Amino acid sequence: TKLVYMKFFTKESNKEIIIASTRPELLCACKTVIVNPKDERYSDLIGEKITVPLTNDEVIITPHHSAKIEFGSGAVMVCSYGDQNDVALFRELELEEVVAIGLDGRMTDVAHEYKGLKPKQARTKIIEDLENAGLVEKIEDISHRTPLSERSKIPIEIIPMEEYYLKQKESVEKMKRLGSEIKFYPEMHQQILMNWLDSISID
């Protein structure tokens, strides 16, 4: 996988900040840049607006402990549905979601001129456009774990869809009672059910 070091610029001071990402095709879905609050390189920039390359969107630099000081430049762009970490951060920081990849596996309208491309195609084209604009500091080849479909071996993308959720907490005791009346083969599976029921803490 290619780790692309891209040039972002703060709005007020026009200070260059390098942000490394393996997903430059998701620049259009970037809604904040996080830095570790202990990272002295960025302590004076927290709260400032920063301009996303190519899209020219403005996002806020946000302190967050999950930004690893030693990885890349220490500054991380957070894009909705980039990976599970991004999803968790979007929920925690209550950011507005942007759906960059559709159900057809192609870039959506928010990707503008990259609309209709597959993510890998968009990545290649965006890296080329970033380089032509002088917005790439360097590119590194790295080993990167990517979840793959078991059947097709194609990288899995997180795509938001409507889902229905059932209330669980109020039925835990009833489920335990029913579970204790069922004969399990092997018997240890009954304990697996009970352990799972004990782990339910939210609806």
What residue spans do the PLM features occupy?
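NTP-handling and nucleic-acid-processing catalytic cores
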Residues: 1-104, 128, 132, 171, ...
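Active-site neighborhoods of enzyme catalytic cores
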Residues: 1-26, 118, 122, 138-168, ...
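A glycine-biased structural micro-motif
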Residues: 44-47, 113-124
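Short secondary-structure junctions
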Residues: 49, 134-141
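Alpha-helix capping and helix-loop boundary segments enriched in small/acidic/polar residues
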Residues: 74-81, 114-118, 166
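Short glycine/serine/threonine/alanine-rich loop segments
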Residues: 95, 116, 135
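Short acidic beta-strand-loop surface patches of small beta-rich interaction domains
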Residues: 105-110
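Two-metal-ion acidic nuclease core segments, chiefly of the RNase H-like superfamily
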Residues: 119-135
